[in-house]
Every structure is written in C-alpha cells, then in structure tokens.
C-alpha cells in the first residue's frame, strides 16, 4: 500500500560552497562499512563513495559505465560486460574479473541483506581478466538497475584480512571489512567512530574525474533535529539533510544558507503480512490481510493529500504505485491517487465479514524517514474513522 514519495531537501552554508572540506550532518549513522552486509540507505549512500559497481546512475538516473566500460546481450539471458582496465583498489591492488566473481559469491551469502541486487543472476563466468558473462535464469530487464548497488570488493584484500564472509550484523559480529574499506571509488574512508563521525578524503588515483571541489568530508550523525539545525546555523557543519519539514520554510529565508531540493526515488509504503495463517499481533482466528477487501479498505481510508499538506508541508507527493517518477517503468496513468472514501471502506469491511472493524498492531520506525512516526500516527487516526483500530508500535531502526 503506497502512501507517498519524499521530496528531499538539503541546506548548505553559503560559506562552504568554495571549501575543500565539507562538514555534513544527517540523522542516522551508517550501520557498517561492509558493502554487502546491510541494505540501509545511509550506509549504502556513504559506503558507495568508497566502493563502486559495474554500472552507475548519472544525475538523471540513466545507466552509465563504471567498473564496466560496455555491455551487450549475447542471448536473452546472458550479458557480456567488458571491464575497465588500469583500475586499482585503494591499497594499489589491480581490479580484475576475479574481484567481480568473488563479490558475486560473497554478496549472496545468507547473513547479508543485499542479495536482492543480484537477484535472478544464476552465474557469472570469467571469459578473460577483463571480460565476464552474467547469466540469468530468465530475461532480466532490471539487471543494470540492480547492478548499480552491487559493489565490488578486492578478493585479495578480503582473503588477507579474513573477510571472505559477510559480517553477520544481526549477531553483532565485528569483522575487518565491517570497520575498514578498500574500494576503487572516489573517496577513501580514513576513519569511522560509530555514532560520532566518519572521515573521507579524495582518492587521487581514481580512474574518473572528481566532480566539484570537495576533497575531504567529515560526516557527523546528529539524531536530534533541533541540534542538527543549530549546528548548521552556528557553522559547526556546512550541510544537513533529513530536515524536519516544519523548519524548511524558515531555513529557506536564511540568507546565509542555500537549499538544494528535489523529488526522491523512495516511495513510502505500508507492508502487510499476507503469508501467515494468523497474525502475531492481531486476530488469532485468521489473517485479515489475506482478504483484498480489507487491504482496499485500509488504502481507501488514507488521505494522502492531507499527509502531504499537514505533515510533510508539501515536501512529498501522494503516490498510488511503488515506482517513483524518474524510475524506469513509472506510469503517470497508473499513479492517480483516488479520493479518500471512508464509507466505501466501511462497506468493504462489512462485506469481508468485519462490520465492527478490525484490530492489529502497526510497526513503524521513528528514526529512519522524515516524519516517519508522525505519518504512521496520522494514518492510524484516519483508519479509525472507518473502524480500523491499529495500535502504533514505534521503534528505532538499526
């Protein structure tokens, strides 16, 4: 069930625009430096400055070469990639096809959460040191998009540092690759003090040309919204993201700040357990979410425009589908938000055998997305008008 699309906003101190060092703050810290361990937005965003994929998105979300220079279909299920020559990892080790094969085997290990990005790929074959064949179990139209987040590690470095296996983050395992990096990317992570700061410096030996003038980055996670904004206004940091929507208008009018904003490709949605026969935190006789009428009633009860206006302060877009504008496959015809219909929702619940409504628990993060807990609480209040009684279980993510 889709709710809305985020519109990201970042504020920068005007004095930082010519600086070589960028002091950046956001709400969350990374979870690990292991690029295959945790599918977490902040972690992926930062770690991908050190590690690179075979292909990457440009600023318009179009696929362009990265560690692969070209690719072509050999047959409907096989894509041949030519790899970039004369690329070295940060420790000086040359990049070859062996590193791609190793990374493919590694990312699929069950203790990680990044397997989705090589989903459908059956095998990667080495043709020579700079040519590989990626073989899928069936035609795979999303292969290149997924490979944007399939980051390549050095086989030699992982073997040397006993990091052939992905860190078991859930078991609180600490490995060398979880606290150190060795990629081919534009920045070298020099230091990470969890929940305090992360320091990066430009990789002078990078195969590509660095965009912009930033040679050093100091990233500081600041959970408190007021503290993060105060750090920006005082000059302790140069840029902040994850801004509270209620403060955006005020900050826009601050002469010493510049704003960068635009739509994200993230869609916020509610996921329901449709697989279990009965719910852990709901009616014990049956799983109400298996009935499409219940799910439709829940969707019809949500006023997406009210969330956009009152909670997100017009920094979101109502959504009806999971695919965001700008992403391949988006359809404006399908993304038409239907008006809220409380009476229609009540009728659907009655038809489904629940004239007195339904009850369940809604798990919701309170530190991952902008206004995440507030959005969940608003949805619960909207549901209540249709007889849908949900208990909010807000929790920290990570």
Language-model segment annotations:
Residues 300, 317-351, 368-373:
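Structural transition elements
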Residues 25-75, 105, 182-184:
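N-terminal lobe/hinge region of extracytoplasmic solute-binding protein
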Residues 62, 151-211, 216, 342-343, ...:
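Gly/Pro-rich hinge or "lid" segments in bacterial periplasmic/extracellular proteins
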Residues 72, 116-166:
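Surface-exposed binding/hinge segments that line
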Residues 28-44, 67, 93, 143-153, ...:
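A structural "hinge/loop" feature
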Residues 69-113, 127, 131-133, 138, ...:
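Aromatic- and charge-enriched surface segment that lines or borders ligand/interaction sites
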Residues 204-250, 292, 380, 389-391, ...:
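Ligand-site clamp/hinge motif
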Residues 97-103, 131, 185-186, 214-216, ...:
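Alpha-helical secondary-structure segments
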């Amino acid at each position: 069930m889709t709710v809305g699309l985020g519109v990201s906003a970042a504020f920068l101190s005007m004095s930082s625009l010519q600086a070589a060092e960028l002091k950046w703050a956001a709400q969350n810290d990374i979870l690990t430096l292991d690029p295959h361990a945790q599918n977490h937005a902040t972690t992926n965003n930062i770690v991908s400055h050190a590690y690179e994929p075979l292909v990457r998105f440009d600023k318009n979300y179009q696929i362009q070469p990265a560690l692969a220079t070209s690719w072509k279909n050999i047959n409907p299920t096989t894509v041949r990639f030519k790899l970039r020559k004369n690329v070295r990892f940060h420790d000086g080790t040359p990049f070859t096809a062996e590193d791609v094969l190793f990374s493919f085997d590694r990312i699929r290990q069950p203790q990680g959460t990044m397997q989705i990005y090589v989903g459908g790929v059956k095998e990667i074959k080495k043709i020579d040191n700079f040519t590989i064949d990626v073989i899928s179990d069936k035609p795979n139209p999303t292969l290149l998009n997924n490979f944007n987040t399939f980051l390549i590690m050095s086989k030699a470095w992982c073997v040397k540092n006993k990091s052939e296996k992905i860190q078991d983050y859930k078991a609180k395992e600490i490995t060398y690759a979880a606290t150190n990096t060795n990629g081919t990317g534009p920045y070298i992570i020099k230091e990470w003090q969890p929940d305090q700061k992360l320091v990066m410096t430009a990789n002078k030996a990078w195969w590509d040309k660095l965009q912009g003038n930033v040679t050093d980055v100091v990233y500081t996670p600041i959970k408190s919204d007021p503290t993060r904004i105060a750090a920006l206004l005082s000059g302790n940091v140069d840029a902040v993201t994850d801004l509270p929507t209620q403060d955006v208008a005020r900050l826009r009018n601050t002469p010493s700040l510049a704003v960068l904003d635009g739509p994200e490709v993230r869609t916020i949605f509610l996921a329901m357990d449709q697989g279990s026969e009965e719910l852990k935190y709901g009616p014990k006789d049956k799983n109400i979410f298996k009935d499409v009428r219940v799910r439709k009633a829940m969707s019809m009860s949500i006023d997406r425009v009210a969330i956009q206006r009152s909670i997100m302060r017009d920094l979101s877009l109502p959504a009806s589908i999971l695919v965001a504008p700008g992403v391949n496959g988006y359809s404006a015809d399908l993304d038409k938000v239907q008006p809220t219909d409380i009476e229609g929702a009540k009728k659907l619940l009655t038809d489904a055998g629940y004239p007195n409504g339904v009850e369940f628990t809604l798990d919701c993060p309170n530190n991952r997305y902008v206004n995440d807990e507030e959005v969940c609480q608003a949805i619960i209040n909207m549901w209540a008008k249709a007889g849908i009684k949900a208990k909010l279980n807000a929790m920290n993510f990570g």
